[in-house]
Amino acid sequence: MTTDIVWPPPVRQVRAYRNIVVDGACNIRCTYCEVKKTKVDQPATIRSLDRIFAEYEPDAVLFRVESDGEITLYPKIVDHLQKRAAEGYRVEVLSNGTKLPRALEGRPDLLWVFSVDGHTEAMNAKRGLKQPQIDRILDAAVELGAELQTVYWGQPVEEVNAYIDLLESRGYRGLLHFMPLLAFKGRPLTVNLRYQDLHPADFLAPPEYFRRWNHIFETGRRDAVCDQITNGYNYQVSGDEIRMVKCDCYSVPKHLVHGFGPIREFDDWPCGTCIANQEFNNSRERMRVPQGRIPLPLV
């Protein structure tokens, strides 16, 4: 018997992940969010964004750009992100979707992630969204294949499954990412969502994600390493000021936050009890480098 040996063996390559959070106000009042009043200097913020982009080769990184509030309230910033995306940078924008469909106009090169807690007003009770707003978000997500980020705060599983079924029936081809209402200051999670209770769908996170969530809920401890730690880094932008940190989880020690410069790697990051969208980041389609193209460093 002969066996064909392929050499070198196929390797799935992924981009680096860089999360950029800019200052911003918000136009909704989620009961689980901490919103601070702030004045945003858009030209200064754009200069800081360009300093960050200059550190990387286009298409070698997936940038996730979001705001402490709602980024589409700052059109000059989003327009600049579109410009950089058109130049070859891979940029996804996290939005609460309240400015749809206008927020999409003239920005064809951006990737989108929309925050919505389900398909009904009841599921979005903590966000205060009305049904027409929810419908516009889901319409855009289905049309664009945009990712959906859903906070699970205790909605009935029957409603969660109805949400999954609706997206399945509409041919949704993005990623539906459930994340628990975070526990502040390292306290154990207060909500649990089990994979075996959910209707199967290709757009859900893998079963291992939910197993990790269940473990943290039951024990108050982690037993696995998040992809943010293996392949991610965070930038916090406030006008001309840029701060950096490996992960911006709640209660991160202040001495681990540093000024703009080289990234710092850690053998033992002090993870708390959070679990969020970065957990299986490397498995996302947006993170994958196309087959047959291997970016090599300049030497």
Curated annotation (Swiss-Prot):
InterPro entries: Aldolase_TIM, MoaA_NifB_PqqE_Fe-S-bd_CS, rSAM. The keyword Iron applies. [4Fe-4S] cluster 2 binds at C226, C247, C271, C274. Pathway: Antibiotic biosynthesis; neomycin biosynthesis. It holds the Pfam family Radical_SAM. This is Neomycin C epimerase. Catalyzes the last step of neomycin B biosynthesis, i.e. the irreversible epimerization at C-5''' of neomycin C to give neomycin B. To a lesser extent, is also able to convert neomycin Y2 to neomycin Y1. The lineage of its organism: Bacteria, Bacillati, Actinomycetota, Actinomycetes, Kitasatosporales.
